[in-house]
Design a protein with these regions (language model features):
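A short acidic, Gly/Pro-enriched loop at the edge of an enzyme's catalytic core
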Residues: 109-120
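Conserved beta-strand signature within the Rossmann-like core of class I S-adenosyl-L-methionine
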Residues: 143-150
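Conserved class I S-adenosyl-L-methionine
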Residues: 1-58
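A short, conserved alpha-helix within the catalytic core of class I
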Residues: 127-136
Length: 203
């Protein structure tokens, strides 16, 4: 792994967040969308557990949940503190998981610490538009991309990011997923303003 000065700053910023709020519900309780995506799309397509990639997985709340369903999960995050918490939170499941500290702003599916594509690639509340094609490349033919993050409407709500660079415009996620077959898409504003997607990479 290698870090630029900017990614070092990002790593330190997230390290501080994880260390200050270790064990907080924010880092340990999975977003309900994962369970819905699993029962509605992942399980029907893959009744036998496969391999999954969790990008910007932090302390492992989504990776660990999927590992509990029998899946082999690789988690990548820029924060070594977050990844170490994920390893600890996983407990015995850690033996069936892979933990990678790396700068995702330069993520290349062909250069990571794995050799095959994944049945499921997921990312929650992480937006790096430039690597979206690499995320899609990491999905094996017939596999799924499961994605959820904030939209521009979040700027007017409490919490979450306010920088437009970290917020999706209306319909933007569908554009980013162009070329995939969309199975589920929803934009909504409740306590958070989010867009969520399940899309399949055709064979």
């Amino acid at each position: 792994m290698s870090f630029t000065s900017s990614s070092n700053n990002e790593r330190e910023r997230w390290n501080q967040k994880y260390l200050e709020a270790a064990g907080a519900e924010t880092w340990t309780v999975p977003d309900p969308f994962l369970a819905r995506a699993f029962s509605g799309y992942i399980l029907p397509l893959f009744p036998h557990p496969g391999s999954a990639l969790d990008l910007a997985g932090g302390a492992g709340r989504h990776a660990i949940w999927l590992a509990k369903q029998g899946w082999e999960v690789t988690l990548i995050d820029v924060s070594d503190a977050g990844v170490e918490q994920a390893r600890q939170n996983a407990g015995p499941l850690a033996s069936h998981m892979h933990f990678v500290v790396d700068d995702l702003t330069h993520f290349k599916a062909s250069q990571t610490e794995f050799e095959t594509a994944f049945e499921v690639v997921m990312a929650f509340f992480y937006l790096e538009r430039e690597i979206f094609p690499e995320m899609v490349q990491a999905v094996r033919p017939g596999g799924l991309l499961v994605y959820k993050t904030y939209t521009l409407a979040q700027a007017k709500l409490a919490g979450g990011p306010k920088n437009p660079a970290h917020l999706l415009a209306p319909g933007e996620l569908l554009q980013l997923a162009d070329g995939l077959r969309v199975l589920h898409y929803c934009e909504e504003v409740t306590e958070k303003a989010t867009a969520e997607l399940v899309a399949r990479k055709e064979k």
